[in-house]
Amino acid sequence: MLFGRKMPSSEKFRDYVLAQFKGELRVTTRKMMGEYILYADGKIFGGIYDDRLLVKPVAAAKSMLPDAKLQLPYDGAKPMLRVTAEQIADKGLLARLLDAMLPELPAVKKKK
């Protein structure tokens, strides 16, 4: 464990998560310190941390994932909702989750 973290997320897991979103919405990633920030339509909706899919705990996500546990992506971060392996395997659920979350998410701020 380095600085209280496990090993970085694998590209294999990132590729699997992206494949589950493929064709539903435009989902992209940006690598940051061994992990992946997830964007949909230019908005950050979650990330891949230690090979876990975590999403922002907006009202729509809490409603659609009522049993999801809040977990920290890394030390000092705000808690996010953990999406289980079974939920990741359900492409329809992921598409509905993003459709519901996007209106609640702020646009990414442009750097000056």
For each predicted feature, which ranges?
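Charge-dense, helix-prone N-terminal extensions
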Residues: 1-112
